[in-house]
Amino acid sequence: MSQLNLIPFFCVIIVLSVEDFPLYTIPEKIGPWTPIDLIHLSCPNNLQSEDEGCGTSSVFSYVELKTGYLTHQKVSGFTCTGVVNEAVTYTNFVGYVTTTFKRKHFKPTALACRDAYHWKISGDPRYEESLHTPYPDNSWLRTVTTTKESLVIISPSIVEMDVYSRTLHSPMFPTGTCSRFYPSSPSCATNHDYTLWLPDDPNLSLACDIFVTSTGKKSMNGSRMCGFTDERGYYRTIKGACKLTLCGKPGLRLFDGTWISFPRPEVTTRCLPNQLVNIHNNRIDEVEHLIVEDLIRKREECLDTLETVLMSKSISFRRLSHFRKLVPGYGKAYTILNGSLMETNVHYLKVDNWSEILPSKGCLKINNQCVAHYKGVFFNGIIKGPDGHILIPEMQSSLLKQHMDLLKAAVFPLKHPLIEPGSLFNKDGDADEFVDVHMPDVHKLVSDVDLGLPDWSLYALIGATIIAFFILICLIRICCKKGGRRNSPTNRPDLPIGLSTTPQPKSKVISSWESYKGTSNV
């Protein structure tokens, strides 16, 4: 708004007259030419002039749309997804505990989602704690399942509100719209069965924050209001206006597509369904200074050209291009015929692509037909070159259009994961992938030996086990000794030297080494 106040006669043209700054303007049709003198040349006026017979009178207040207004008003909100964290443990015979973590979904409530959102934006540690998996419980030779419910908040989640129907629009809604948003149902269902969308402001009643109060001066003809001059000095006519309500606020849609509201308007005609308000989007705010600079430069070029023409008392085809009206609307077109300067009143239309007026070589298309030239000369500096091509001076100076194209290409909107058209969700209730990036990682764990006993009992058990182990070793050793004695042969008493046992009749027994020696000497 501040820039509009600084440069009222240039920026208002763009904001209020056209949706985007046009690439070029071309007359809707060419009327009869009238010869003029050089002193009749004038730089185009892109502002509407006041109606004849109407004069400025009293100051009054009116309501208009804010700068940056969008037909789809942005509504900031968040999504809330219900997730059940499960910890399943199994303890085997020797005490090894296997823990497996799982995630499933549940349907949340709007009240619980609002509380979780407040925790998150306020930095309450309870929100982060609620996302962690539960501490698993276990029991010997049993499977134990421990569950914990969490609410995953993803923000921001921006939806759009249509200012005409007051409905919310977003690809994340099942039908693309959420039309039953009231205080009694302060949430919208999404294309994910376990996710709700809620606005940041719990008191949102679809009231539009798109209006601003301004001060202007009425232009009256007796008791009839012809129009008014707004606070930026731009005159607006009431001719062709119709009644249109935006966000429940009655007002008027003016002929140029702008919207205003003031008490007791005299207009009674209602707008048709296709008569909507011009879009004034953020892109225009971003390039506003570029547009203003370009318009100022073109205005200065036109004034410099006019000064040069009047000083030199001569004009060329190229210089006529500076006197073309830059935006759609009524103006004048100029040409040179038989050495005389000519003008005609025309209505300019915007051109967004050169192919609209140059469909083929040598053809300048106006009113769906190729217009004739006079010795290679058309109007407004447009000529036909020696090779048959149409030469338009502005085709070489489309810097402003390049600025807008660059800005359009540099927009990277933040997308909510549910907006992705190719998103597929699990039908069995298991948690979907988009919640994983907003929750701590989970994995399968195998614990050390754990019998589920307290520390002192565990130490007592370990001590008893060690004692029992030593006792067992002692018992094994004793048993081994007793078994070895039973299996060993009986020891005989030693005999005196020189005596031998009585020989057995069937075998010769040598009882000692001495006896063996004596026997061997015989």
From Swiss-Prot:
In its keyword annotation, does this UniProt entry include Nucleotide-binding? no
Question: What residues form the membrane-spanning segments?
Answer: 456-476
- Please list the residue ranges that the record places on the Virion surface side of the membrane: 26-455
Q: What are the record keywords, sorted? A: Glycoprotein, Lipoprotein, Membrane, Palmitate, Signal, Transmembrane, Transmembrane helix, Viral envelope protein, Virion
Stored InterPro entries:
PH_Rhabdo_glycop, Rhabdo_glycop_CD, Rhabdo_glycop_FD
Topological domain, Intravirion: which ranges? 477-522
Q: How does it sit in the membrane?
A: Single-pass type I membrane protein
- Family statement: Belongs to the lyssavirus glycoprotein family.
UniProt subunit comment = Homotrimer. Interacts with matrix protein.
This molecule's function is given as: Attaches the virus to host cellular receptor, inducing endocytosis of the virion. In the endosome, the acidic pH induces conformational changes in the glycoprotein trimer, which trigger fusion between virus and cell membrane.
Q: This protein is called what?
A: Glycoprotein
| Gene that produces this protein | G
